[in-house]
Design a protein with these regions (language model features):
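N-terminal small-residue-enriched
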Residues: 1-132
Length: 132
């Protein structure tokens, strides 16, 4: 949806994100973790940007915990950068948890001076994504 928002009535309106969430699914988080041969469970996403013309996205998580043979390990990585082609990322979602959590309030920025409040959160997703 072509939402336009602005920081105040004195500022220019820009197309930008609002509060969009995935609907909760039916999968148990324990089953999602158990289904991963090798991967990472990511925590505390805090940054992201998109390229709407080319459908690319990049997000950052504070940390990730390695999963090996369906079990969380003691190996932490930080920070974690995720990137990819949005349609491919959405098609790769194979499990959606039955939990749902809204995490605090963040901000959507345009340049260095334009900020509006947004929220993030939702269910846990099992997805294939490029990490770097």
């Amino acid at each position: 949806s072509g939402n336009s928002r602005r920081q105040s009535y004195r500022r220019k309106a820009y197309a930008r994100m609002t509060n969009t969430f995935f609907e909760r699914g039916t999968d148990k988080l324990e089953d999602m973790i158990a289904s991963v041969r090798h991967g990472y469970m990511l925590f505390e996403t805090n940054n992201g940007m998109e390229d709407p013309k080319n459908w690319q996205i990049q997000c950052t998580a504070e940390y990730g915990i390695e999963i090996v043979d369906g079990k969380l390990t003691d190996h932490y990585v930080s920070p974690v950068v995720m990137s990819g082609f949005v349609p491919d990322l959405l098609k790769s979602i194979s499990m959606v948890s039955d939990g749902f959590e809204v995490i605090g309030a963040g901000q959507c920025g345009k340049g260095y001076k334009e900020w509006v409040r947004v929220s993030d959160g939702g269910p846990n997703l099992k997805v294939r994504v490029k990490l770097g």
